[in-house]
Amino acid sequence: MMIIEPHIHMLSRTTDDYTAMYNAGIRCVVEPSFWQGVNRRHPGTFFDYFQLSLEFEHTRARRYGVDHWSCISVNPKEADDLPLAMETLAGMAPYLDHPRCVAVGEIGFNRITPNEEIVFQHQLEMAKARALPVLIHTPHDTAQTRKVDGVSRILDILREFAYDPSMIVVDHNTEETMPLTRKTDYWAGLTVYPYSKLNPR
């Protein structure tokens, strides 16, 4: 049986992880764009990252028997710097049109700010223009942010957006947000980690 890993960030992993995944039956992975630990300061650093994901990482994975695909986006964690985000979106088309790009994502909210919403909506439009699937990041619960509020706002935006629900994954749901997402026709994603988000218990 072939297993597909639909959401993994391999740029921060070693080739030992590819070997372990292959041994477990994983033959295909999809890597969404993500925040690398510090905010980028220039559009060019985003573009270098997109190229690395689309070309180098695909080649690296293939050496270990794994087919690697990418989702391209300005991640919500970096969407609050609106001038930088918009300049990056203006140059993102070649990466979205790359044959190894299979979706736009992750997009959505980090702190549920107006700037994040602007960037989210622009990227939804970019996906729709290309008939690409969309992978949506829902915010984490923090002292300042409630995940359920972020999911509610995301679902409101998606209703206004009127894109084929079968093309949209609302990811990182929890027991608090799953009832909201399951009332819609969007795919409801769960994230399993050993010690955070959902875990085996």
Regions found by a protein language model. Give the residues of each.
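Mid-domain alpha/beta scaffold segments of enzyme catalytic cores
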Residues: 1-157, 161, 167-168, 172-176, ...
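H/E-rich (His + Asp/Glu) clusters that bind or coordinate divalent metals
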Residues: 184-201
